[in-house]
Amino acid sequence: MNQDHPEFDSEDLAQNPPETDPLKAEIESLRSEIALVKADALRERADLENQRKRIARDVENARKFANEKLLGELLPVFDSLDAGLTAAGTQPSPLRDGLDMTYKQLLKVAADNGLTLLDPVGQPFNPDQHQAISQGEAEGIAPGHVVQVFQKGYLLNDRLLRPALVVVAKQD
C-alpha cells in the first residue's frame, strides 16, 4: 500500500477500477453515432448515383427505341416494295425506277433512325437473327449457311425487330 498517495495503491486499483470519465463515454458514443451517419450518407450517395445512372440509361433507351412501333409497322411496306421490285424484273422502266428510288429513300430514312436490314444469303445461320423455315440443298453454299431468304429481317439499334425467314443448307 502506498502511504503517501493512497489513490495510486495498486491493490486498490486492481479491485476497484476507476470510474470512466462520463465525457469520454459521451465522446465514444458520439463517435460511433458519427460513423453510423457517415455510413448512411455514403449509402444514400451511392443509391442516388445508381438511380441517376438508371434514369440516364432509361432515357437513352427511350430515345433509341422511340421509333420502334412506327418502323415495325413500316416493315410490310418494305416487303411490298421489295416484292414489287422483284416482280418488275431487271428491265428498266420509269415505273420500276420510281419504285426503286422510293424503296431506297425509305430504307435510307429508316437506316438514319437506327434500322438495319438483314439479308443473310450465304452467311452462317444465326439463330439470334434468323428463323429457319426449311433446309435445302444449294451448290456452292456451305452446310449451315443461308441458301435463300423468304422475308428479310431487321435490327433496330442492334436489337432484333424481326428475324429473317430463311432456308438453311443441309448438313452432309
From Swiss-Prot:
InterPro entries: GrpE, GrpE_coiled_coil, GrpE_head. Its main location: cytoplasm. Residues 1-24 are annotated as: Disordered. Coiled coil: none annotated. Participates actively in the response to hyperosmotic and heat shock by preventing the aggregation of stress-denatured proteins, in association with DnaK and GrpE. It is the nucleotide exchange factor for DnaK and may function as a thermosensor. Unfolded proteins bind initially to DnaJ; upon interaction with the DnaJ-bound protein, DnaK hydrolyzes its bound ATP, resulting in the formation of a stable complex. GrpE releases ADP from DnaK; ATP binding to DnaK triggers the release of the substrate protein, thus completing the reaction cycle. HAMAP family: GrpE. This is Protein GrpE. It comes from Xanthomonas oryzae pv. oryzae (strain KACC10331 / KXO85).
